[in-house]
């Protein structure tokens, strides 16, 4: 999968009509946003990312902008796509609601505060990143699979049952099977 396309391949696969490719790309885009939102500080989401707005090539038609490819990502907000955010099976609906859900989770848990301790844990796979955020109330483990294959994160946080904040499912933080371009936000109270 080529990740150099707009929005992790959403643009490329959308124009090709490749539904499986679009679904994978949406999952990858959500995983990247989940990683960003699990970090300390103020997350910045560029205008249009929340609805899957693809690159705008019209800058090439303006002689004052044509030589500066940064305008590729600086097109006007595509308001015609915005209503699709309320349709669950569209790219816009999937991205908008996933980001909204992640933002709500982040604002509801103190473990995302800047005062939380942060460290990585080894997953024994270079395509999987696992981070731990911890404070006096909660322990969070973010697991991110940046591969196009299902993988096992060989972690062994043997300290109780965790809830995946994204899906609501309970699981142990040991040998976690993670789907291609997928992620888990595991959390438990102390």
Language-model segments: residues:
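C-terminal beta-strand-rich structural cap/linker in extracellular carbohydrate-active enzymes
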Residues: 172-190
């Amino acid at each position: 999968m080529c990740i150099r396309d707009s929005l992790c391949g959403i643009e490329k696969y959308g124009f090709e009509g490749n539904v499986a490719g679009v679904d994978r790309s949406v999952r990858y885009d959500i995983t990247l946003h989940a990683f960003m939102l699990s970090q300390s500080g103020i997350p910045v989401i560029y205008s249009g990312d929340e609805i899957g707005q693809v690159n705008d090539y019209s800058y090439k038609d303006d002689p004052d902008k044509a030589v500066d490819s940064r305008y590729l990502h600086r097109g006007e907000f595509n308001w015609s796509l915005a209503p699709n955010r309320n349709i669950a099976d569209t790219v816009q609906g999937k991205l908008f609601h996933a980001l909204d859900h992640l933002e709500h989770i982040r604002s509801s848990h103190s473990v995302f505060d800047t005062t939380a301790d942060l460290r990585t844990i080894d997953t024994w796979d270079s395509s999987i990143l696992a981070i731990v955020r911890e404070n006096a109330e909660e322990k969070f483990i973010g697991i991110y699979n940046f591969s196009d294959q299902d993988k096992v994160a060989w972690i062994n946080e043997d300290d109780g049952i965790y809830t995946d904040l994204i899906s609501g499912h309970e699981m142990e933080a040991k040998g976690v099977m993670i789907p291609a371009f997928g992620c888990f936000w595991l959390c438990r109270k102390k």
